[in-house]
Amino acid sequence: MSIRWLFPKLTPRKVARILILLALPIIALTQSQSLRHSQDDAMLHIKPYDGAALPDGFYVYQRLNEKGIAIKSITPEQDSLIVRLASPEQSIAARDVLRLSLPKVTITAQQATTPTPFWQQKLTQKQSKLG
């Protein structure tokens, strides 16, 4: 049994257009959600003092993993390491653990922020005045 009798003038091209129009808002929403999640990333910037050696990334991973601190990635960058943590709440605990484990380094906590999209700025720019 065919459903052609429900939509007699619906061609495959029109069906494709409808599907694309339905998919675009879904894609936009998922992208905005992923941007929001990436704003919550916390980073630690580990830089050795002058003359000290850069710690091994695996050693840093082991020290943090022992304390149950979830790590997204450890990336070498010039003369330093960038440690991305799974949650900002773990940033302080990770910094304390690494200060005890690595006495010859400077550890700076950074909150990764991405700029707010233009369309989102425009939506939140004007506040409605009630009353």
Swiss-Prot record:
Residues 32-131 are periplasmic. The chain crosses the membrane at residues 15-31. Keywords: Cell inner membrane, Cell membrane, Membrane, Transmembrane, Transmembrane helix. Its main location: membrane. It is found in: Cell inner membrane. HAMAP family: Modulator_MzrA. This is Modulator protein MzrA. It comes from Pectobacterium carotovorum subsp. carotovorum (strain PC1). The gene is mzrA.
